[in-house]
UniProtKB/Swiss-Prot annotation:
Subunit structure: Homodimer.
Name assigned to this protein: Endoribonuclease VapD homolog
Intrachain disulfide bonds: none
Organism: Neisseria gonorrhoeae
Listed GO MF terms: nuclease activity; RNA binding
Keyword Nuclease: yes
Record-stated family: Belongs to the VapD ribonuclease family.
Keywords: Hydrolase, Nuclease, Plasmid, Virulence
Function as written in the Swiss-Prot or TrEMBL entry: Cleaves ssRNA, mostly between U:A.
Length: 92
């Protein structure tokens, strides 16, 4: 499983994206879904596909968004070997 995590500079995104911050996040989600990524929380997306070429393609697609490079503060990708969801334990 791979993950992509990013942080946008809100002021830069508001200035660079023609439709604003909410649409910027929607565009990112749409772009990453094309490569099998699912939003887990905030700006963290994961993908079950173990092909690193898919990961690189997703990042390149984000880079191709005209407003993204000038709006992103940080973007990281990493492999998740084990994933445990403790939500139901905490909520019970």
């Amino acid at each position: 499983m791979y993950a992509i995590s990013f942080d946008l500079v809100v002021a830069d995104t508001a200035q660079n994206h023609p439709k604003g911050i909410s649409q910027a996040y929607a565009d990112i989600g749409y772009t990453l879904r094309k490569f099998g990524f699912t939003r887990i929380q905030g700006s963290l997306y994961t993908c079950q596909n173990e092909d690193m070429a898919n990961l690189f393609s997703a990042i390149n697609e984000l880079k191709a968004l005209p407003w993204f490079p000038s709006s992103v503060r940080d973007i990281r990708a990493f492999r998740i070997e084990q994933w445990s969801d403790f939500t139901s334990l905490v909520k019970s």
